[in-house]
Amino acid sequence: MISEEKINLNYTRWIERLKHYDCYSERLIDEIGDKIKNASFSLQESSGAAYQGSMIDVVLNNLCVIACHLNSLAFGVNKDKVLHPYLQVNQNSLIRELLLQHIAKAEMFILQTNQWKAKQGYLFDFNPNMNTCLKCGERTTFLCMKYGIELTEEEFEAIRIIDKEDSVANQYITPLCQLVKMANQLVSIELYRKHKEQNKENNY
């Protein structure tokens, strides 16, 4: 859980970054901004990311941070020399993609109303009133199109990477896609382990 003040602060920071990275849409904010502000990143409590406002909280404070560290430290510049020029991705494109990737959850996830499911740790549930069965990445790209946010071909592909099952390594996948996928996986591991450790401490 985070405070209402933190939720509002995160939302303000998120909007500022949208504007800075040229992926801001006034209509998006006007029509579903409140839903985005309060959206959960995950459905299940054990994930460590199922709470009001967690979508933006996780994106800003975990996802963007880890992805940018990977891009700059693992693939970036060392002593004025690019370490891995064929792997490093454009930082602006990376952050644009990460800021937007999970906005579909604002429409897809709703607060849990079933007490039995809530007791099992499912604090949020899928919205039964969705008109289609688009996955998160697909719905996010639809929302970007709907609200006039332009994406490059690589950004479009990278947003949808979270919808895809792990498969045999593909040498044609873009570094942006692979980095985004890796960052999402690492964030899931980090938040799960943090939540597990906090639960252990609380039980002592």
Model regions: which residues?
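Metal-dependent phosphohydrolase cores
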Residues: 1-204
